[in-house]
Regions:
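Catalytic cores of alpha/beta
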Residues: 5, 9-28, 58-68, 103-121, ...
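Catalytic beta/alpha-barrel core
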Residues: 5-6, 30-31, 52-57, 72-84, ...
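Short, aromatic/basic amphipathic alpha-helical patches
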Residues: 17, 87-92
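Glycine-rich phosphate-binding active-site loops on the catalytic face of alpha/beta enzymes
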Residues: 21-42, 70-82, 116-121, 144-146, ...
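Short domain-boundary/entry signatures in modular proteins, especially
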Residues: 40-52
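Short acidic, glycine/proline-enriched helix-loop-strand junctions
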Residues: 46, 90-96
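Internal alpha/beta domain cores that form substrate/cofactor-binding pockets in large enzymes
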Residues: 53-56, 139-143, 147, 152-160, ...
Length: 215
């Protein structure tokens, strides 16, 4: 049986939503016909890594992320985090919302849940799982990029060849392109590198980061 998502796919996030829902194929005729470069639009919809901006706490920062073209917007719902949000803010259907939890997922009404194990009160990124409707759909690898160890890249790339990987850890406008080239992840995630203070985003850095992901 072939499951086809027939309509309404105009953004990379919508294509990812169809994929995560179990679609084997999507119809994107109108989106391609309206695009100046159909081949470029097809690659945009189907193949490039998703860009996630996480640690959002303010409506103006959510708007800046969406205006920049972010595919995923993340809200940390762990009270102990310096980037804790009171709730997941509304997100249009052109993007996907992600609730970030430590220990177990609650019910935030988001498209995805990102659940980290609790270890001494800290998020342990390598053990994170992405859930859709309670079902695992991918992993988060939070790698220590500040350490000059090529093995990190190689191990992450090996995992990314077998399953959906969201890559995180020190990613920002200046580092995300190299990470994408080395690992070929399903998505990339940035938070602290896009801030002026915990939970307060720098809109220019958000834009530069998303542009680097799309480059």
């Amino acid at each position: 049986r072939l499951v086809v998502a027939e309509s309404g796919v105009h953004t990379r996030a919508q294509g990812a939503a169809a994929e995560l829902a179990g679609a084997d194929a999507i119809l994107v005729g109108s989106a391609l016909m309206q695009a100046p470069d159909p081949a470029e639009k097809l690659a945009e919809l189907l193949s490039r890594p998703l860009a996630k901006v996480c640690g959002l706490t303010r409506e103006e920062d959510v708007e800046a992320a969406l205006d920049a073209g972010a595919d995923l917007v993340g809200f940390v719902l762990e009270p102990a985090s310096p980037r804790a949000a009171d709730r997941a803010l509304p997100v249009p259907e052109t993007a996907l919302s992600v609730a970030v939890w430590v220990g177990e997922a609650g019910d935030a009404g988001t498209d995805l849940d990102q659940v980290h194990e609790r270890a001494e009160g800290k998020v342990r990124g390598r053990d994170a799982v992405l859930l859709r409707d309670g079902r695992p759909v991918g992993r988060v690898l939070d790698l220590p990029w500040e350490e000059d160890d090529a093995g990190h890249w190689e191990r992450a790339a090996a995992v990314a060849r077998e399953e959906r990987v969201m890559l995180a850890g020190g990613l920002g406008p200046d580092t995300v392109r190299d990470a994408i080239t080395a690992v070929r992840p399903w998505a990339v995630d940035a938070s602290s590198s896009l801030e002026t203070a915990p939970g307060v985003k720098d809109h220019e850095r958000i834009r530069a980061y998303v542009e680097a992901v799309r480059a």
